[in-house]
Amino acid sequence: MSGHRKRVYPQSQFQYANSVPAAGQAAAPGYPPVAGMPQADYSQQAQPQAQPAFLTPAQQQLHQQIDQAVQGVGNMQLHNVPVVDPNGFYQQQPPVTTPGAVPSGAVPQMQQQYAQPAAIGKAMNQLYPIDLLTELPPPISDLSLPPPPLMVPPEKFVVPSETANAPPDFLRCTLNALPKSNSLLKKSKLPLALVIRPYQCLSDSQNPIPLTSDGXXVRCRRCRSYINPFVTFVEGGRRWRCNFCNLANDVPMAFDMSTQGVPTNRYERNEVQHSVVEYLAPREYAVRAPPPSVYSFILDVSQNAIKNGLLATAARTLLETLDTLPNHDDRTRISILAVDNSIHYFSIPTDEEGDHIKMLDVVDLDEPFLPMPDSLFVSLSECRSNLEKLLSQLPEIFQYNIMNKFALGPALKAAHNLIKRIGGKIIVVSSTLPNIGVGKLSKRNEAGVANTSKEASQLLSVQDSFYKNFTIDCNKTQVTIDLFLASDDYMDVASLSNLARYTSGQTHFYPGWSAAKLTDVTKFTKEFSKHLSMDLSMEAVMRARGSSGLRMSRFYGHFFNRSSDLCAFPTFPRDQSYVFEVNLDEQIVRDYAYLQVAVLLSSNTAQRRIRVITICIPTTESLPEVYASADQLAITAYFAQKAIEKVFSSGFEDAREFLNKSVQDILATYKKDIVVSNTAGGAPLRLCANLRMFPLLMHSLTKHMAFRNGIVPSDHRAAALNNLESMPLPYLIKNIYATVYSLHDMPDEAGLQNENGEVVLPEPINATSSLLERYGLYLIDNASELFLWIGGDAVNELTMDVFGTPEILQIPIGKNELPVLENSEFNARVRNIISKIREHSDIITYQSLYIVMGASLSEPVNHASAREVATLRLWATSTLVEDKVL
């Protein structure tokens, strides 16, 4: 490979996006100086940032207009920040605090009294106005920027540290400066909501957070918030004042003692140093001992599942995953139900009792019973050999099955009866529409209804109330349902997905799946295996709290809303995200507000744990400061949830109209209340720099499969809506606005490992077909699939280096893997990039690769794969959301 001569492929003669200034080149001013504890001096005021030495004519005109506006309306305090380069807006700013060493036993003297006002002129994010019409093409590098920083001075922390405010990966607010009044919030037209992801990895052993294991979970006796880095100790440290409700609470003696009774320094405790902490919960937080991990598998053994190979693939994958199934304490239990027009139980003895496995058939679907309850639900450790034997023989047992019925409803009730005393997961693997017994479904007539005002009500509604009512029973008994649906026929994802939605589960949809396709098998086995290996936490509840004036009002995600503010999770997933809408019920009088999320659950290590996440957010009476601190990605996530809600309540047209109107309202408010003068000689479209990608994201959302106009199969539409409901924020943004890499002209280091052993990815380009050269090679990543686009006029050298064939018409299009070419370094680099993109430790998704050939003038009109090529092109180009195609 080292002797391979590097090829130079054709490249564009004009760099389309090079003229766009990089976002975030200068840190925003306004930070107080950082000093060590406890002699910190926070009185120094922020200094104005110097003007840039060179300005473009547009920037000079913009500066003159803003200067005139500031002079003319200075008393109105509309612009109370220094003017800087509008293209130098917020970037990852240096922390406002640095870790300070606290002498052992010493009490920091830098805390203010709870109600003491902040210093006049506190540092806030600054408003950097831009003209959207001059920001073309949109600077997509902004999508990878962090949100505007939380401007919290060190004196607000018990112990200043970089971890004293929760990182945005766990908890981020749509507004990082909260309006003090509801009238100001309404005036802004910006939403106030939280995007929550309490767990960042599929396994708790990856990137663990600080754990407090002494059993002392200190909480406010009035509002029940947990002690956190923003409380104050008063009365000589004997009491602590709650930052949520202002109540002074006694500090328990155990707070200053180790588990061995040795005095310790309270300022070294995790809960006052970190805003993301976990507790080993004391006994009063559990109504029973933590249950074991429980899995009940419902396997479709009907004719469809035999023919397409799903049963054999699922059984083999489960067999290979037994070693990685969570079983830390050897208490994990398993049951297997095979289902067609009957329910087939398997009585599995322990390995010591022998290897005779009995299959017990129950044909009464109206009243399914448990023939031998004690041996149908067995220990993984004690029955390991017999479980392996059963899974190996399962495809053979049903290989000649000709039944085309699938009794999912009765099977769900049977599995629920098996595990309801303990709780756990019911995992359904099916390729057949439930067509017998309770919950029977039928194929809907999509002709004449798709792409009409009746589409949502007739194609996406639940056919049978069983799929909602049954979830109530599951929540009472701590049972989650996960679905793996793989078929080339209609599955009614809209009805079935309710089972997962209201039990904190997930629906995984594999349209057109067949075990005859290696790529289909690879995707299913990798995702099914990762799902089974994910840590299982049971009996979970999550609650969010706000300081005075803040209240959680609406909740979005996969869970069961048990009360006005308590979300219940029979099992807590590691690969989902949630959105909570926040109401401003009363005037906020303080300079800082607080939000806290707590998750209580039973881990699969037989421990009851509490994860607490707290953030401190400055408050303001200034509309420009509210806009300057708006988080465009979190706002997009919120509007996506509201649009999904709108689909089910009033249809797709109203959902698209809602998204468009939301953007129009924000632009109109900014123009009316923040832009202070008109611009001569043009009609600029003004917005602040930290929101400049927001209109594009919302426009892209209207083109998403979940919302776009046109005929979309209802199963695909329902699956897209289901994914948007629960997708973690980074993947949600990528699913809305795909990442496009240009590979034929990528830098020399791209596709190779850097000094840290990480594969270097090329810089993304804008998602528009105007940038796709007819001779180029591009990779499109939308978080669900990967598209490798080869231009129709690509030179033979490029196709030879990538695919091993000089003829472009011989390239294997469709769902395929890139061939391994031993003598092509370029092929290895492209494969490295694909592998890097597929690496995920926080979600189970494995992205299939689709090879797409672009149009060419020399392309035969009626070649054999013309229809498939056209379909693939349309699908791939639908991700290029900057085009006016859809």
Swiss-Prot record:
Pfam families: Gelsolin, Sec23_BS, Sec23_helical, Sec23_trunk, zf-Sec23_Sec24. Its main location: cytoplasm. Disulfide bonds: none annotated. The keyword Cytoplasm applies. GO terms for molecular function: SNARE binding; zinc ion binding. It comes from the Eukaryota. GO terms for cellular component: COPII vesicle coat; endoplasmic reticulum exit site; endoplasmic reticulum membrane; Golgi membrane. Keywords: Cytoplasm, Cytoplasmic vesicle, Endoplasmic reticulum, ER-Golgi transport, Golgi apparatus, Membrane, Metal-binding, Protein transport, Transport, Zinc. InterPro entries: ADF-H/Gelsolin-like_dom_sf (IPR029006), Gelsolin-like_dom (IPR007123), Gelsolin-like_dom_sf (IPR036180), Sec23/24_helical_dom (IPR006900), Sec23/24_helical_dom_sf (IPR036175), Sec23/24_trunk_dom (IPR006896), Sec23_24_beta_S (IPR012990), SEC23_SEC24_subfamily (IPR050550). The gene is SEC24. The keyword Endoplasmic reticulum applies. This is Protein transport protein SEC24. Belongs to the SEC23/SEC24 family. SEC24 subfamily. Component of the coat protein complex II (COPII) which promotes the formation of transport vesicles from the endoplasmic reticulum (ER). The coat has two main functions, the physical deformation of the endoplasmic reticulum membrane into vesicles and the selection of cargo molecules. Residues 220-245 are annotated as: Zinc finger-like. It is a peripheral membrane protein.
